[in-house]
Amino acid sequence: MYVAVKGGEAAIANAHRLLADRRRGDRALPAITIDQVVEQLGLAVDRVMAEASLYDRALAALAVRQARGDMIEAIFILRAYRTTLPRFGYCEPVDTAKMKVERRVSATYKDLPGGQLLGPTFDYTHRLLDPSLIGEEPVDEPVLKEPGEHVMRVSDILDGEGLIEGDGKMPEGHVAGDLTREPMEFPMARDLRLQALARGDEGFLLALAYSTQRGYGRTHPFVGEVRIGEVEVELELPELGFAVSLGVIRVTECQMVNQFKGSSRQPPQFTRGYGLVFGQSERKAMSMSLVDRALRTDEFDEDIVAPAQDQEFVISHADNVQATGFVEHLKLPHYVDFQAELDLVRRMRREHDAAQAGGKDGMKEAAE
């Protein structure tokens, strides 16, 4: 039983003023602009866009600033805004093979068509604090080169030998589900699972992915490929009879390659885990691909022996906005509930004390 209690209007207004004051900080310092957040805190912006399921860098930056850097609060704000937007259709599946690649690495082949493109990455930094960032020291311009040969997919190389499962195909006339408009039902189709994972909490997915590497799941993965870059978004217009471009978005894609010994329905081969997220977030994409493969137990006749393989456990707990709402609702008044519990504990304590006293008297009489 929950009891709604309206706080004092003046107290709430003062709390909002105090929040705005803390958000602004020292008035002697210039306020952070939205452009600064977009350009200099880009990975935070990318995470908010990904987990709010709304690709808009300026709005995500505004949410980050409004939330004082609290990522989950920013995601909540942007997701709430998303519900106010009109929906006018579904785009065509993005073709990541045509991606304008900025970063592409593979752990399976050293030399492959298109080469290894390191791009902007922390992988080779020393993780030491850099005092030069405190000031306004100039930053060297990057060295840019013309693109070379076509950046071929690693999965296409393996597919040429027939050693990896093919790209998943939906039945004729299949309409993709929409997790934001339909209640969750289990077992859940893979397209809906991927939607849930794409907007799931990065930390939760990272922990689950890590668990699969520590023995809680049957995966032996290799990073077939991680690629980051821009892809074109197209929408088919019935009145024209063909798709038109709406623009480009930046995404991170990961294809995880896993060994599979075969089953009664499938031959020995490599299987895939897939991850695709807005912006640059390869940790999230890699975690998503590991969890995606772990959840495909029914396709490969595998037993569910670990949390990462349990659809209901994973999907029901991946959403950080939902999780935050349930955990933080405990701050709301539960006065009636607590009074009932308090009365119950007091009564049980009286009964316990009476039983203890009766037991002592009985022992005393027996001794006499």
Curated annotation (Swiss-Prot):
Species classification: Bacteria, Pseudomonadati, Pseudomonadota, Alphaproteobacteria, Hyphomicrobiales
Protein's name according to its UniProt entry: Alpha-D-ribose 1-methylphosphonate 5-triphosphate synthase subunit PhnI
Source organism, top-level taxon: Bacteria
Gene name linked to the record: phnI
Known function: Together with PhnG, PhnH and PhnL is required for the transfer of the ribose triphosphate moiety from ATP to methyl phosphonate.
GO terms of biological process kind: organic phosphonate metabolic process
Catalytic activity, reaction form: methylphosphonate + ATP = alpha-D-ribose 1-methylphosphonate 5-triphosphate + adenine
EC number(s) stated in the UniProt entry for this protein: 2.7.8.37
GO molecular-function terms, A-Z: alpha-D-ribose 1-methylphosphonate 5-triphosphate synthase activity
Keywords assigned: Plasmid, Transferase
InterPro entries in the cross-refs: PhnI
Family per record: Belongs to the PhnI family.
Keyword Transferase: yes
